[in-house]
């Protein structure tokens, strides 16, 4: 598996300098990212922007000429994770962030699960859809006001059929870290069910403000 995306070979940890960009994160949250996605810019702005936007293509684009780029982005994302995490899966339970659409919804997009399973094909990586979206909601970028962690958590539940063996370390995996609200919601619902679990977040990219908008 190869990748032509200029991601670093290692994850970078969110620290005191970058945490203000993701204001729902707490000092105790351990989150790591590979690339930086520039808000308000399009596909051509950077390789990371191109990958994230292709990866996030809605299922209503299926069958269109551009659909091929979603699958290509998925494989590129998996290759980048493999390069950063190593050729053998660590002893974590990898939990994909649930999409905004519930299971059974025609627009339910399991891209994070498929990406995780593509990192170590044929290996024994522990990938579990532990967190389930109980009802479909609008994607965050389609909502006039960004939801709080509590509002997001209200639609989450644990799939208890996947809860054993109980995880010791959970990596919540998502494509883009924005405000941190989804990570906080996912962390809270996992910690309530597994009080002793250690939780980290792994992201393809973090959102950064457009430098020109700050001038």
Placement of each model-derived feature along the sequence:
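Active-site-facing substrate-recognition patch
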Residues: 4-90, 101-109, 131-166
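N-terminal cationic-hydrophobic initiation segments that often serve targeting/anchoring roles
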Residues: 82-86, 120, 191
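A structural signal for short coil/turn segments at secondary-structure junctions
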Residues: 88-89, 123, 194
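Anionic group-transfer/hydrolysis microenvironments
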Residues: 98
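Substrate-recognition/cap helix-loop segment adjacent to the acidic, metal-dependent catalytic center
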Residues: 107-125
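PRPP/pyrophosphate-binding module of the type I phosphoribosyltransferase fold
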Residues: 141-215
